[in-house]
Amino acid sequence: ASVLNAYSLVNSQGVYGGQRRAAPDQRVFVLTRSAYAGQQRYAAATWSGDVTSTWTALRQQVAGGLGFSLSGIPYLTVDIGGFSVPGRFSRKDPLPEDAEEWRELNTRWFQYGTFLPLTRVHGEVPKREMWEMGGESHPAYQAHLKFDRLRYRMLPYVYSLAGGVTHESGTFLRPLVMDFPSDAAARRVADQYLF
């Protein structure tokens, strides 16, 4: 029987096998835009690609991540803050209201990213580092710092979840329907999950 659209699985398998042969004593990690059920066995994690830096895209990332989880693909990450930035945010001297909206959007995205299997900030302009969010006294900086510290405190828990993925067919993101399958309301919720 032939398998259609298995590119990601075969690609991840090839990269994994090549890395294991080249460096058998080192762990392998494959970050890929493509996805296929079972690719996690080859140390592959999917990221959602170069999405736009908008509120709509942030909402879509949450729903998309839950879809990945329900599809049996547990390792997911995003470009926190988005990657393709609207011009009003990326100007050399953005309007004050645009700069403030960027900080708020980036902060909310960072908070979401704290509760993903892989927390990953990525992008160029505007800067996404917490110290670029308006200085140490700015609420955006303080929120980034708080959630960064929270993520580090959660690392033992995240490692435990990873063990559950490997040994118990678990997942990181659990849409409400996974824990409350008899609840009709939980089946309709596409923007909340347990971690």
Report residues per predicted region.
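Catalytic-domain carbohydrate-binding cleft regions of carbohydrate-active enzymes
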Residues: 1-195
